[in-house]
Curated annotation (Swiss-Prot):
Reaction(s) the record says it catalyses: adenosine(37) in tRNA + dimethylallyl diphosphate = N(6)-dimethylallyladenosine(37) in tRNA + diphosphate
Residues binding substrate, per UniProt: 16-21
SUPFAM superfamilies, alphabetized: P-loop containing nucleoside triphosphate hydrolases
Site positions for Interaction with substrate tRNA: 105, 127
Assembly with partners or alone: Monomer.
Keyword Transferase: yes
Assigned keywords, A-Z: ATP-binding, Magnesium, Nucleotide-binding, Transferase, tRNA processing
Protein name (database record): tRNA dimethylallyltransferase
Originating organism: Thioalkalivibrio sulfidiphilus (strain HL-EbGR7)
Location of the region described as Interaction with substrate tRNA in the Swiss-Prot/TrEMBL record: 39-42, 163-167
Necessary cofactors: Mg(2+)
Length: 320
């Protein structure tokens, strides 16, 4: 729980392609902030183009913590992110700077602020039962079953994501509690920081979809297929790994495997990215205490002023 003289921290949240990085860099230029990435794909090395990872020039000006920390063969979790982010926040605050947490992995934000209950270990029998049902009825039927018992998890997990669907339903079958109840079930912050929660949200969904399509085409021009081909050649990687299941990567992988042609791959990747943005916005709408920044009318100078006021209030020990 934050105390009157708790150090300040900033959350900058938003869907994919909403302009979070540009705004974060502007804040770093103007204020004593240091960026911590809140993104489940940016943690992976060798996955730069398809994740829209900031380039060397941006990173030189505004270093990001928690990017390029894992090999794509490794898995990352909300629990590990929370541990890593708390350590980074403490280091930044101890240096007299302000943690600026930027990203679109909303589960990570919730885990960081509200904590995580201990999840049950995997159960081979339950997993086999779910896999048998999926083999008989399809993963869409598993998704529908999950939606009946855990609507929030079903809203954020795509029907074509068997790994996460299986885990979410497994947790419910083992505990009688939905997975979403473990992910920060309370809305009382556990962080010892005075938080300002900013959310970039589009007023026009169609405009965001257009930005997503343009950005994916830019990724293709920059060499996304070659980047994924480098991963595809590795014998230790496969499409069931979390890194390869990232939006854009799984479609490019399927294209390289001969499962679809180029235009189908492009179309599916753009649609999947739009679906990701929709899920991110669903999470944002239910996130407590956010201040909405309208994406199309964004005034960076006004955001800098708002953050500066938050930092001054924190130093003075004034109210939130």
């Amino acid at each position: 729980m934050p105390q009157p003289m708790s150090p300040p921290a900033i959350f900058l949240m938003g869907p994919t392609a909403s302009g979070k990085t540009d705004l974060a860099v502007e804040l770093v230029r103007r204020l004593p902030c240091e960026i911590i990435s809140v993104d489940s794909a940016l943690v992976y090395r060798g996955m730069d183009i398809g994740t829209a990872k900031p380039g060397p020039e941006i990173l030189a000006e505004a270093p990001h913590r928690l990017i390029d920390i894992l090999d794509p063969a490794e898995a990352y979790s909300a629990a590990r992110f929370r541990e890593d982010a708390l350590a980074a926040m403490a280091e930044i605050a101890a240096a007299g700077r302000v943690p600026l947490l930027v990203g679109g992995t909303m589960l990570y934000f919730r885990a960081l602020e509200f904590g995580l209950d201990r999840l049950p270990e995997a159960d081979p029998e339950v997993r086999a039962q779910i896999e048998a049902e999926a083999a008989a009825s399809g993963w869409e039927a598993i998704h529908a079953r999950l939606a009946a018992v855990d609507p929030p998890s079903a809203a954020r997990i795509h029907p074509n994501d068997p790994q996460r669907l299986q885990r979410a339903l497994e947790v419910y079958l083992l505990t009688g509690r939905p997975l979403s109840a473990f992910h920060g079930g309370a809305d009382a912050s556990t962080l010892p920081y005075r938080l300002l929660r900013l959310a970039l949200i589009p007023a026009d969904r169609a405009a965001l979809r257009e930005r997503i399509a343009r950005r994916f085409d830019q990724m293709l021009e920059l060499g996304l297929i070659h980047e994924v081909e480098t991963l595809y050649r590795r014998e230790d990687l496969n499409p069931s790994l979390p890194a390869i299941r990232a939006v854009g990567y799984r479609q490019a992988w399927a294209y390289l495997a001969g499962e679809m042609d180029f235009e189908t791959m492009r179309s599916k990747a753009i649609i999947a990215t739009g679906q990701l943005a929709k899920r991110q916005l669903t999470w944002l709408r239910s996130y407590p205490g956010i201040e909405v920044l309208e994406m199309e009318q964004l005034d960076p100078a006004a955001v800098v002023a708002r953050v500066r006021a938050h930092l001054e209030a924190a130093r003075a020990g004034a109210g939130p």
